[in-house]
Amino acid sequence: MKLNIMQSIQITAVLSLLICSPLWADTVSDFQNSWTGRALDLQRKIDNHTPMSENNILGTHNTYNSEVYRACNFSVGCRYLDPQQEYSIKDQLRMGARFIELDVHWTAKMENLFSYPKRLLLCHGLCSLNDKYATEGFNEVKAWLEDSANQDEVIILYIEDHSDGRHQDLYDQITSRFGNRIYYSGGCQSIPSTLTKNQVLAAGKQVVVWKDGGCSGNSSMKNMAFTGLGEIGRVWEDSTTIGTIGEIFNGGIERITANDVRNGFAQGHNIINLDNMNTSDGRIAAAIWSWDQNEPNNLNNEDCAMQWGNGRWNDANCSNQYSFACKNVTDGSWVATASTGPWAYGSANCQALGSQYIFEVPTNSKDNQALKAAKEATGYDKVWINYQDQSTEGQWLRSE
């Protein structure tokens, strides 16, 4: 069989794709179906009723600055040569990032050989004529939000504003993608310290927009974007080459490690923004403070949650006899009852301690550690918590 030159080139290109492209399943899908992915999904729902200023939230730093988008063009140069992420914006969301950071610049974009208009682009440091449009980043967020599996998710979208005052353009681009999903600020204010994810979802919304740079003079942007995080704390790292060089002269900072994630949440940090978020370095798994490894497993119809000796959770038979986790709603402290009983007796046993006590479930790592200490002070190694899936298997709920 004779092949012409073009056929040979096409066959070579196809073979190259087959050789270079991974033949295994999507690693992000594998992660989502793993225990870590499922446990994080369950954990994100625990704190829906509590203020976001008390939540533990994984995010990514400079979400758009990913090696996935790295490219060079003969006429316009290279983009994202010093990346901080390995995956696309959408895949970072799929891995559990709920704080997304996009740096939007009003800068030149080469649209053809003779056209270099200014556009809103996503760029880090020195912008390139080849950088992606801001709308491309918004489109990835939009695609993730529209997935039926994500209708109960809430994200914070942080816009680092270098738009040179093009706030109407920026507003139009954001709202045309997911305007009906945005929880509006209503004016120049930080995110309220009492705002919960349940409140956002009850309004039919999913996106809380924070734009830095102060209050916008544009009425539309002013009414949509929050101007600060308020009492929500945030820590981040900078793994770029430029950032590393800066550390040499500034005395250096440690990278965020798995232990940093674990200890940071235990100390009460709200948002931890990772560079190079991936499924294999242990930092995502370190964000899990609730369910123990391979739990819940519904062994022998276990439908009620308890905390055991190491502070992690297990699903147990609801008729087992354990102490009860009671939270003081006045000062936020925890007590483990001296009395024991089946899970259903939790509310009554906590109320017996006083009207300020309720049968409760920890909603962040710091609270979970406080309950562990209270349990140990009582002399027990197991305690019931107010969390169960008795009505529908796998749908874990806090009983009101």
Give the ranges of each region predicted by the language model.
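Bacterial N-terminal signal peptides that target proteins for export
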Residues: 2-11
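Bacterial N-terminal signal peptides
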Residues: 10-20
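Long, acidic (Asp/Glu-rich), low-complexity accessory segments flanking structured domains
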Residues: 25-99, 106-156, 163-169, 173, ...
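Active-site flanking residues adjacent to catalytic metal/cofactor-binding acidic residues
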Residues: 100-102, 385
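Surface-exposed patches in mature extracellular/periplasmic domains of secreted proteins
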Residues: 102-105, 154-160, 185-186, 357-365
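Acidic, His- and aromatic-enriched active-site or binding-groove loops in soluble protein domains
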Residues: 176-190
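Extended amphipathic alpha-helical segments with heptad-repeat/coiled-coil character used for oligomerization
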Residues: 195-197
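Extracellular, disulfide-bonded carbohydrate-recognition/adhesion ectodomains
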Residues: 204, 214-400
